[in-house]
Amino acid sequence: MNEEYIKVRGAKEHNLKNINVDIPRNKFVVITGLSGSGKSSLAFDTIYAEGQRRYVESLSSYARQFLHLQNKPNVESISGLSPAIAIDQKTTSKNPRSTVGTITEIYDYLRLLYARVGIPYSPVTGLPIHSQTVAEMVDIINELPKGTKVYLLAPIVRGHKGEFRREIINLKKQGFQKLIVNGEVCEIDDLPKLDKNKKHNIEVIVDRIVLDENLGNRLADSLESSLNLADGITYLEIVELPQAVKSQFKKNQRITFSEKYSCPVSGFHLTEIEPRIFSFNSPFGACPKCEGIGKEFFFDRDLIVQDQRISIKDGAIVPWGSTSSKFILETLKALADHYKFSIEVPFISLSQNVKDILFEGSGEEEIKFEFHDGSKTQIIKQPFAGIIPSLQEKDRTIESVLIKEELAKFKSEHKCTACSGFRLKDEALCVKIANLHIGEVAGMSIAALQKWFSHLEEKLNQKQLFIAKRILKEINERLKFLMNVGLDYLTLSREAGTLSGGESQRIRLASQIGSGLSGVLYVLDEPSIGLHQRDNTRLIATLKRLRDLGNTVLVVEHDEETMYEADHIIDIGPGAGIHGGRVIAEGNAEKIKHFEESITGRYLSGRQTIKVPSETRVGHDNRAIELLGAVSNNLDNVDIKIPLGTFTAITGVSGSGKSSLMIHTLYKAALKHLEPTSKVFPGKYRELKGLEYIDKIIDINQSPIGRTPRSNPATYTGAFTHIRDWFVELPESKARGYKVGRFSFNVKGGRCEACQGDGLIKIEMHFLPDVYVKCDICNGHRYNRETLEIKYKGKSIADILMMTVEDAMQFFDKIPLIYEKLITLNEVGLGYIKIGQSATTLSGGEAQRVKLAKELSRRSTGKTLYILDEPTTGLHIDDIKKLLKVLHKLVDMGNTVLVIEHNLDVIKTADYIIDVGPEGGDKGGKIVVCGTPADIAACKESHTGRYLKQYLV
């Protein structure tokens, strides 16, 4: 293909205003602009979608039936288009079997490496295990002194129950005369009857030999016969040694030989060492107990009794309710009488012994139970089974899916006790390279793994090195790519479902570089998300390398450093939604600076900035929340103090422990304290102080606000409740007798029943993601014809749901209840989204800001602690300015705002900063420095401080 440009003509997808743009091929191109300006509409919904559609159309009709054919984007023409690959943030696998190792294929190479050069060790003795040929066995036997009398034994039964009549009859037919049964030599004709309920060991005496030089082939032939009888294993038993000869061997000593892999002492053996035994997704390798998941689920005492402050009688034992069942109440009363405790006191005041009996049962101790049924009284003496064994029995025997789901609420997740969380069978975990099994290697961080592999060649012998050379090359290259995109702190065993969108995207980016493709159009969505400024340079170098392979790299991005390094920038705007959709500026960063209409250009040139506050807040009378001794994940016994009434930023390189500290420990521990029934499990810590100063803790994260098309910003913020109430009060509604439910799309009455108020019909694609198509009965309007006849200012309720937040604000400007809900959405920079936009189409950043808007619209107590994890995701610097205004407004109302953030424009406005590090993974988990932005900038050990310094000038 010789075209110099990808030429887009007449693009009108979503809010794009018939734009024409030439994108230079084989270059690193950034598309930027405000959130909602149309960047993704151009990059993903137009250019990538058309590239994908053309590819699918080129396939046979048979192949096309398995693929979702995209609709043609609303564009007149696109020429110069290459095969397109999208690397976005929405395709993270939630399958617990998908890990960093499997996604990057490093684990596949590891399996091959262990299968080819790994050495098996007996888990019993720790001795190395080798397979042997018959010739090798003969050589070992010939090392015994001449004149030694030996038996060659075929172990046909090893520790199994049974009478084994059929096996003995078969041996008789083959001409064998003597057996060793449970250590005793027996004639096959005089064999005593075996107890079928006891375990037995039976060995066939295949040959009795006195070793000398004239044996010829007898030894080899006998060995082959013995190996055939016992599935590749044979024993050599030394019966008698020559008296005159001193030897290392002893009388009655047994030597184990195996054509397979067998331990000479314990008898532990492997049938094969192939890549499949190292796969936790294969029945040949997966741990039989957890089936390769690495986790088990047990009934948890803390979930069974969620609030120890209430009594058993009042419902402390959650699965048994408030003991409303007469049978349960009488059982517990009998138990209380027997062990002398009360069911009317708080559960926490019961002795540990009583708690243990309640949970695990009374063992063999019998309790007198009296059950009253009307006029009858039944007395039973029996042990008490215990809450947990009772729940286990119910879980095992019940077939109802609903009851099983209900029981699952009382279980917590733990490492598998059989495989210690390594997911594999013992046979796989006994194979080692440089004293480490594959599970231990997969559990190392990428940085540690790279270091281990760099020294591995020194630990391999010549034969191993020759076999492993190509495998090691592939592994080292992939590790280098992961290092280059700032993921050195991840482990290969990390589940894909636990990765952030940015991490997942960068893993797939590293995989693409490893594939070495050229002539491809790569479309990326903010790859810098979640990346510390220190690692950004390496990411940009990776993107350039992708370009240098002969590819076009098209990146939707807001990061200034990325823009300065790009070959070409396309600025979409000037505003968001209907105010965007035009190409405002094109060229490199220096050219963009001079376009007056470009908001991006104004910030690049410094004409517009986010100012550093003239002073920082010190908080409420030195009140603070103190978390002491946090040790979750990589945290190293961390102590922190968060001043209340401040805007506090948690900083540090990726993987340093910020989320472990703030989300997994502080947030969950505080929530458990404030709401004891909440199903959260905080990371380990010693003490949490200062919670008496707050009444709420809210994690405003990027999880979806809903999982169906019925969820939308209007319903989530509560604006839709007021809109429905307003429509009910309209004269036409009153005349028809319509109630509030008429305008709900969640209940029958006014909604379209064909789509049940979704506006879309879900088509299940079985092994592909479900597809939603517009309902052809209501044409996507959600309501039936009669409901749509009710109008306010000429607009039906469906028309209102199609309005943007800005339009709806103007429409309802005289109705305070609705207007106040909508204005908060506008304040967080979401004026461009439709109030009825499906929750499933909102980005993580948009969902987070909808949640923030909901919090803003609530009456503030001034005692709330808000936690936000990377709230700048997906935001242009001008949107960040609006967001900061909102967050500081929350603090001015007396609340405390805690943000985990890498964006230096946010960090510089903080009152207080806690910098975690100094590195990621095992080299992180410590507090590097705490204080004001100036304090952080002055700290030489802080990576954040080094970059923050230039922002404080």
Curated annotation (Swiss-Prot):
PROSITE patterns (alphabetical): ABC_TRANSPORTER_1, ABC_TRANSPORTER_2
GO biological process per UniProt: nucleotide-excision repair; SOS response
Keywords annotated in UniProt: ATP-binding, Cytoplasm, DNA damage, DNA excision, DNA repair, DNA-binding, Excision nuclease, Metal-binding, Nucleotide-binding, Repeat, SOS response, Zinc, Zinc-finger
GO cellular component: cytoplasm; excinuclease repair complex
An example Gene Ontology molecular-function term: ATP binding
SUPFAM superfamilies to which the protein is assigned, alphabetical: P-loop containing nucleoside triphosphate hydrolases
Cellular location(s): Cytoplasm
Keyword Metal-binding set for record: yes
Domain ABC transporter: start-end pairs: 320-599, 619-949
Residues reported to bind ATP: 33-40, 652-659
First and last residues of each zinc finger (C4-type): 752-778
Disulfide bonds: none
Keyword Magnesium: no
Subunit field text: Forms a heterotetramer with UvrB during the search for lesions.
Protein's job: The UvrABC repair system catalyzes the recognition and processing of DNA lesions. UvrA is an ATPase and a DNA-binding protein. A damage recognition complex composed of 2 UvrA and 2 UvrB subunits scans DNA for abnormalities. When the presence of a lesion has been verified by UvrB, the UvrA molecules dissociate.
Family classification: Belongs to the ABC transporter superfamily. UvrA family.
Protein name listed in UniProt: UvrABC system protein A
Lineage: Bacteria, Pseudomonadati, Pseudomonadota, Alphaproteobacteria, Rickettsiales
